Amino acid sequence: MKKMPMRKRFGQHFLHDSFVLQKIVSAIHPQKTDTLVEIGPGRGALTDYLLTECDNLALVEIDRDLVAFLQKKYNQQKNITIYQNDALQFDFSSVKTDKPLRVVGNLPYNISTPLLFHLFSQIHCIEDMHFMLQKEVVRRITAEVGSHDYGRLSVMAQYFCDNTYLFTVSPQAFTPPPRVESAIIRLIPRHNFTPVAKNLDQLSHVVKEAFSYRRKTVGNALKKLINPSQWPLLEINPQLRPQELTVEDFVKISNILN
């Protein structure tokens, strides 16, 4: 089967290292009864491994040439469904299953952050997620309060999920090699976060506004939203910087606005 050309506009870097692929599958630990959704399967390198472990696999691929390639490659497979769709627009709840989805993929680095936010909006139908991402993005997701990497993505990802940095992947594991290191992360949805955000759009807005002015105090960064008299009620020091606030702090700020 002829090789497919890579499209730069889709940020395509195809994983080829069998050791890394086996390590990813081991981390996912798929079961026969699972429903797996692979985002951006490319030429099917990871797909081949997943098919031996799982009886229900859905592929979401935007590149029409790769979709044709995958349809031909897997035309005898009865346990695979291929969706030609933009993952940023895909309705993950449309995948037919009686169990929550397990979502995996080597995410295109140029859309990884908006794609994560799209997945957070559909977190109710997801059991867990395992992704290859740019190492810098994984560090931001898992960053601790007060660290340089802690920001908007950290807060929102940690509100929705428990996140674990699993291992690093070198550029040489890909064709063509990206200019940055990659990393594998596991995200498990949280269904009992306390306090609960009353309005997720409001929470996202507060976090985005605060980190737009991360060098200012949070009192100044959020002065359009929070009156000085409200800070004592929140029990939050308005002289702190946004990166010094916990996820719980941001939820409390969001909730007082409703």
Swiss-Prot record:
Protein name according to UniProt: Ribosomal RNA small subunit methyltransferase A
A Gene Ontology biological process term: rRNA methylation
Gene Ontology molecular function: any one: rRNA (adenine-N6,N6-)-dimethyltransferase activity
EC class of the enzyme, as a word: transferase
Record keywords, A-Z: Cytoplasm, Methyltransferase, RNA-binding, rRNA processing, S-adenosyl-L-methionine, Transferase
SMART domains: rADc
Family statement: Belongs to the class I-like SAM-binding methyltransferase superfamily. rRNA adenine N(6)-methyltransferase family. RsmA subfamily.
Function: Specifically dimethylates two adjacent adenosines (A1518 and A1519) in the loop of a conserved hairpin near the 3'-end of 16S rRNA in the 30S particle. May play a critical role in biogenesis of 30S subunits.
UniProt keyword Heme present: no
Pfam families on file: RrnaAD (PF00398)
Residues involved in S-adenosyl-L-methionine binding: H13, L15, G40, E61, D86, N106
Gene Ontology CC terms, in alphabetical order: cytosol
Domain of life, source organism: Bacteria
Localization per Swiss-Prot or TrEMBL: Cytoplasm
EC numbers for this chain: 2.1.1.182
SUPFAM superfamilies per record: S-adenosyl-L-methionine-dependent methyltransferases (SSF53335)
Record gene name: rsmA
Catalytic activity as recorded in UniProt: adenosine(1518)/adenosine(1519) in 16S rRNA + 4 S-adenosyl-L-methionine = N(6)-dimethyladenosine(1518)/N(6)-dimethyladenosine(1519) in 16S rRNA + 4 S-adenosyl-L-homocysteine + 4 H(+)
Phylogenetic lineage: Bacteria, Pseudomonadati, Pseudomonadota, Gammaproteobacteria, Legionellales
